Amino acid sequence: MDRRIFGLETEFGVTCAFEGQRKLSPDEVARYLFRKVVSWGRSSNVFLKNGARLYLDVGSHPEYATPECDDVRQLVVHDRAGERTLEGLLTDAERRLEEEGIAGEVFLFKNNTDSAGNSYGCHENYLVSRHGEFGKLSDVLIPFLVSRQLIVGAGKVVQTPRGAVYSLSQRADHIWEGVSSATTRSRPIINTRDEPHADAERYRRLHVIVGDSNMSETTTMLKLGATDLVLRMVEEGVVLREMTMENPIRAIREISHDMTGRKPVRLANGREASALEIQEEYLEKAKEFVESRGLQTPTIKRVLDLWERALRAVATQDFSLVDREVDWVIKKKLLDRYMAKHDLPLTSPRIARLDLAYHDIHRKRGLHYMLAERGMAERVCSDIEVFEALSVPPQTTRAKLRGDFVRAAQEKRRDFTVDWVHLKLNDQAQRTVLCKDPFKAVDDRVERLIDSM
């Protein structure tokens, strides 16, 4: 698929630090966060002017689903805009708490595990054609997804009975199946619940739930860009080596705990291969594919370059090659320096706090933002682009129709209902437009509906 629709859904961790007597549960904190949203949207599940969806997910986790994007870089911008949207809710919630005499700070974390061991996710969505074999797609994709934490993991200090270890991925220890239709109960690598949010005869939505939430823009770009290239190769029938794993769930945990990338993983055909070898195989094929198809866009060039350097960094253990571009490496460098400076072990509670602070989405507190400010974490997009994406939908996908409709209805104070495919005015006529084509950014029916307000 030359042009693909992408989207990211990110659940955020919520916590609160209170100074007074009154303590609030995460549920209560979440209600404070969403009070402003509920006051104008009459619900804690709303679509915004930029085409995105904002809602309160199970277990009081705020979730932001980006609008449909047809470009990896554009999606990185909209993913950042989601962080800014939630930062706005956070500031508003703190102000309300203060007005009510409750002293405390609200924290939102873009990570994947809380102190109680609960896991929440960052789900990637890729539109794929209905006509291919989904089984074949997942066969090729699973070894890639299991091993890609080597280059796109968010990193985490894990406390074990034998002491603390640094893992590549936050999510790896919480994945229980390869392919499944459930997302929470049995956390698979690929979720097969068939909800294309598009014409079901033409498309299906590949829902990848194995990935970490990334703070680094360059890591997000690599995660999406490399996965897109692997998908394109499968769609075009590129022959890839048989990499099916004997036990992908055991493999994902073993790989996460091995920073050398060299631990052998048993394959279904009896052979063994390391995460490094598996990733190198996909990278070589992707480079040949891009070369032969003439696909050298600036983003694809940047993705391939970072992919190659990240693997070289793991192979040589010289992480200075990517220590401003890959999340788990950026974070490890930060923790290592702090431990050396203060003579602390990895088990220190101060290190656990630092690990968490890396994922704080408040720009004045979050360590990733501070590093980016000092040039120690590279960017993909500018603050101006992110600011614009807060209120302007992507102009080349269905998100434009939805965003324009929401904006017009709010300005005209009209009652409306919106989801990924429907736009509805709740008037006597109950007029509804069904938008089944996610690639379509212009539609006369939507224009007429807006004009009729």
UniProtKB/Swiss-Prot annotation:
Swiss-Prot/TrEMBL catalytic activity: ATP + [prokaryotic ubiquitin-like protein]-L-glutamate + [protein]-L-lysine = ADP + phosphate + N(6)-([prokaryotic ubiquitin-like protein]-gamma-L-glutamyl)-[protein]-L-lysine
Report residues binding Mg(2+). 9, 55, 63
Highest taxon, organism lineage: Bacteria
Give a GO molecular function annotation for the protein. ligase activity, forming carbon-nitrogen bonds
User: Span of the secretion signal?
Assistant: none
Biological process terms from the Gene Ontology for this record are: modification-dependent protein catabolic process; proteasomal protein catabolic process; protein pupylation
Q: Which residues form the active site?
A: 57 (proton acceptor)
Q: Per its record, how is this protein called by name?
A: Pup--protein ligase
